[in-house]
């Protein structure tokens, strides 16, 4: 498992499929870049597994799933022959997109051994908050309202039920729910700004207040620090672990 190439100008990287997702994140972090596929299991899952299952992750709403983040593949077929599709060209409209057959096929068509991935500029700022709502329908209504109300990139919108949050609070040390009133549903929302936006907080506050006034959401708490943001994300990322 190794990094084959990293091109900050072209915003691409080529890696072997055995690399952990967390290792890819670390390489991008060192170079002030971002690979936006993000999963709670990133410390143990490989990019090859992510490709084989076409993983979505918490950034799928804005960046797309793994298929949308992949430019090319190297694949070994059942007869041992190797297909090299490791392109790094973004505007490539030639021929069949064979990579799309292998992504999500779970190894049934061939074994993915390397991949060309898209990387992105790292956001300058992130704004995280946790809201509560009465139902999934109300949560989706809030999503539509956000999408209509601002051009600030909405990079995460995760709906979580009360039972899942209770399980995390019970079984994960240090887990904290920043909203004082219990709710049936919770929404983790994160905006990312790729330039310093002095009006972003005010605009997001306006949207949240409108959601509260219209009773689309019941409550909302902003993360005022990276520590508070991490506490909110820990609720979402530990749901699977808390159920073991």
What role is predicted for each listed range?
Residues 1-244:
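Noncatalytic alpha-helical scaffold of FAD-dependent oxidoreductases
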């Amino acid at each position: 498992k190794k990094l084959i190439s990293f091109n900050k100008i072209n915003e691409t990287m080529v890696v072997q499929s055995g690399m952990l997702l967390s290792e890819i994140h670390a390489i991008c972090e060192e170079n002030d870049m971002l690979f936006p596929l993000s999963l709670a299991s990133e410390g143990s899952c490989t990019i090859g597994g992510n490709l084989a299952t076409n993983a979505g992750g918490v950034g799928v709403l804005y960046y797309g799933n793994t298929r949308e983040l992949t430019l090319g593949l190297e694949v070994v077929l059942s007869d041992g022959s190797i297909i090299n599709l490791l392109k790094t060209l973004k505007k490539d409209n030639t021929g069949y997109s064979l990579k799309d057959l292998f992504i999500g096929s779970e190894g049934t068509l061939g074994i993915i051994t390397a991949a060309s991935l898209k990387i992105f500029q790292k956001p300058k700022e992130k704004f995280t908050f946790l809201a509560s709502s009465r139902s999934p329908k109300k949560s989706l209504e809030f999503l539509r309202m956000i999408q209509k109300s601002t051009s600030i990139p909405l990079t995460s919108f995760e709906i979580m039920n009360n039972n899942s949050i209770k399980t995390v609070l019970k079984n994960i040390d240090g887990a904290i729910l920043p909203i004082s009133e219990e709710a049936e549903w919770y929404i983790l929302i994160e905006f990312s700004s790729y330039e310093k936006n002095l009006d972003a907080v005010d605009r997001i506050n306006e949207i949240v207040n409108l959601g509260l006034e219209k009773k689309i959401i019941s409550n909302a708490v902003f993360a005022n620090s990276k520590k508070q943001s991490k506490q909110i994300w820990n609720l979402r990322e530990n749901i699977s672990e808390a159920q073991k």
